[in-house]
Amino acid sequence: MKMKLFQTICRQLRSSKFSVESAALVAFSTSSYSCGRKKKVNPYEEVDQEKYSNLVQSVLSSRGVAQTPGSVEEDALLCGPVSKHKLPNQGEDRRVPQNWFPIFNPERSDKPNASDPSVPLKIPLQRNVIPSVTRVLQQTMTKQQVFLLERWKQRMILELGEDGFKEYTSNVFLQGKRFHEALESILSPQETLKERDENLLKSGYIESVQHILKDVSGVRALESAVQHETLNYIGLLDCVAEYQGKLCVIDWKTSEKPKPFIQSTFDNPLQVVAYMGAMNHDTNYSFQVQCGLIVVAYKDGSPAHPHFMDAELCSQYWTKWLLRLEEYTEKKKNQNIQKPEYSE
């Protein structure tokens, strides 16, 4: 009997020429039905704050917003699929940069010498009109990435409200900043731990990277600026040190979700090779780096995932970085680039 009533209601709706949009507003019942919009409530008052705190930290997982969200695939899980087509495979890009420039400097050695500083370099970043690595990556995201990011943002604002969204994103970036400060204290031989730093060392993120830190030695640079004068971009790298005996540009990342494969880190490899290429040709540095390391740390303290990049892999990502840089330059010429929301 209830099924017949339900079928009758459906026929009435079709005969009334209800649109798809109108049908979405109908609340069905087995005994009666009504049509109307739900009463608007304050989404910030009813939000599950624990749930969305974890969600925001998962999406805004990195210091730079090139990775916010850090994954088109993660966005698809949050927002639903956009289309039935498969996401393009980055490995299928066969384009060649028009203006090729080598990532490695043939005039430099990757072996330490007497002129190398005993104290890690920490060159301040000079704010100027030269674009940063983060800005280039932000401004050259695919249209699908931009769309998914904006859709995610609007959904979060709907749930949290404008003030709630700002508060959560601020907390995420503050947490990332403190994580990097704690690592700097650990890796700097001349640093003395303050009470605040000691508290930071007890965080899950620091616990997560303990097994990685055991293999890190010979720190050459920490939170240090690099500039590529020929290709005209700047950046602020996290660390240059030896990992398992090989000198690397190290990038520390945080994530709520496991990222056991380098493909899961999305634009992070491009960030690493961009810093590497700039540093290898920056006169402030006397040495050369040919390897990269992305370390993804987890808040719950579970072991971080290290993603090592040898010289061959770095060269492959360098080609992709040059393409993104050319795309940025072309957009700038066409005056289509807007001021970035975040910078390094």
From Swiss-Prot:
This enzyme's EC code(s): 3.1.-.-
Major localisation: mitochondrion
GO biological process, any: mitochondrial DNA replication
Membership in a protein family: Belongs to the MGME1 family.
Upper lineage: Eukaryota, Metazoa, Chordata, Craniata, Vertebrata
Gene: MGME1
InterPro entries hit by this protein: PDDEXK-like_dom_sf (IPR011604), PDDEXK_AddAB-type (IPR038726), Restrct_endonuc-II-like (IPR011335)
Matching Gene3D superfamilies: 3.90.320.10
Catalytic residues in the record: 238, 251, 253
Cellular component aspect of the GO annotation: mitochondrial matrix; mitochondrion
Subcellular location: Mitochondrion
Protein name: Mitochondrial genome maintenance exonuclease 1
HAMAP family given in the database record: MGME1 (MF_03030)
Top-level division of the source organism's lineage: Eukaryota
Keywords linked to the UniProt accession: Disease variant, DNA damage, DNA repair, Exonuclease, Hydrolase, Mitochondrion, Nuclease, Phosphoprotein, Primary mitochondrial disease, Progressive external ophthalmoplegia
Pathology linked to this chain's protein: Mitochondrial DNA depletion syndrome 11: An autosomal recessive mitochondrial disorder characterized by onset in childhood or adulthood of progressive external ophthalmoplegia, muscle weakness and atrophy, exercise intolerance, and respiratory insufficiency due to muscle weakness. More variable features include spinal deformity, emaciation, and cardiac abnormalities. Skeletal muscle biopsies show deletion and depletion of mitochondrial DNA (mtDNA) with variable defects in respiratory chain enzyme activities.
UniProt modified residues of type Phosphoserine: 343
Functional description taken from the UniProt entry: Metal-dependent single-stranded DNA (ssDNA) exonuclease involved in mitochondrial genome maintenance. Has preference for 5'-3' exonuclease activity but is also capable of endonuclease activity on linear substrates. Necessary for maintenance of proper 7S DNA levels. Probably involved in mitochondrial DNA (mtDNA) repair, possibly via the processing of displaced DNA containing Okazaki fragments during RNA-primed DNA synthesis on the lagging strand or via processing of DNA flaps during long-patch base excision repair. Specifically binds 5-hydroxymethylcytosine (5hmC)-containing DNA in stem cells.
GO terms, molecular function: 5'-flap endonuclease activity; single-stranded DNA 5'-3' DNA exonuclease activity; single-stranded DNA exodeoxyribonuclease activity
Misc. remarks from the entry: This protein may be expected to contain an N-terminal transit peptide but none has been predicted.
